[in-house]
Swiss-Prot record:
GO terms for biological process: glutamine catabolic process; pyridoxal phosphate biosynthetic process; pyridoxine metabolic process. CDD domains: GATase1_PB. PROSITE patterns: PDXT_SNO_1 (PS01236), PDXT_SNO_2 (PS51130). One of its GO terms (molecular function) is pyridoxal 5'-phosphate synthase (glutamine hydrolysing) activity. This is Pyridoxal 5'-phosphate synthase subunit PdxT. The gene is pdxT. It catalyses: aldehydo-D-ribose 5-phosphate + D-glyceraldehyde 3-phosphate + L-glutamine = pyridoxal 5'-phosphate + L-glutamate + phosphate + 3 H2O + H(+); L-glutamine + H2O = L-glutamate + NH4(+). L-glutamine binds at G46, E47, S48, R105, I134, R135. One of its GO terms (cellular component) is glutaminase complex. Pathway: Cofactor biosynthesis; pyridoxal 5'-phosphate biosynthesis.
């Protein structure tokens, strides 16, 4: 399996490390040609406005949207969650707009307000998951087609819709591989669907 990792900014190496640990290959996505032959795509955290402009500059925005409509599994963390959303509060930035969600940016404040805590995520099993939030966004509202995997104080922090997965936290900064394993299961389901 080959998983593309958007390499314009953010924790690219950290995502690569976990995907490799799980026994799969990665490819850095910098240009549209890099998208050829990938089985899934990860959008790492970073600064969402900058990343959105770079997606346009490097000609990646439209090809990624097209792949999303073709059901390619896409996983966004932190700013990746923002990019996947159709609606971003107080922002006109470019976005992929693939998930029926309404997002608030920098919801947990500045760098100093960032934090780490263990939270139960039932879909990942009984052991609480170490969530790391860095100037994290959250999903304020979600349409019916969105499955909420984790919420806290009415803020949606982890969700999926069809082939898309979005987390407001940074699973790539932990040693716990369960979120990435869950995404890989999405890819395997997609591959089975394609082979029907």
């Amino acid at each position: 399996m080959k998983i593309g990792i958007l390499a314009l900014q953010g924790a690219v190496r950290e995502h690569c490390r976990i995907v490799h640990k799980l026994g799969h290959k990665t490819v850095d996505i910098l240009y549209p040609r890099d998208l050829i032959g990938i089985d899934g795509l990860i959008l790492p955290g970073g600064e969402s406005t900058t990343i959105s402009k770079l997606l346009v500059r490097y000609g990646l925005l439209t090809p990624i949207v097209e792949l999303g409509h073709k059901k390619l599994p896409i996983f966004g963390t932190c700013s990746g969650l923002i990019l996947l959303s159709k609606n971003i509060a107080k922002s006109e930035q470019y976005r992929l707009g693939l998930m029926d969600t309404y997002v608030k940016r920098n919801a947990f404040g500045r760098q100093l307000a960032s934090f780490e805590t263990k939270m139960p995520i039932p879909i990942l099993g009984n052991i609480p998951y170490p969530t790391i939030f860095i100037r994290a966004p959250y999903i304020d509202k979600a349409d019916k087609g969105v499955n909420i995997l984790l919420s806290h104080e009415s803020r949606i922090l982890f969700a999926e819709q069809d082939n898309f997965l979005a987390a407001s936290f940074h699973p790539e900064l932990t040693e716990d591989v369960r979120v990435h394993e869950y995404f890989i299961q999405k890819i395997l389901s997609y591959q089975k669907f394609c082979n029907l």
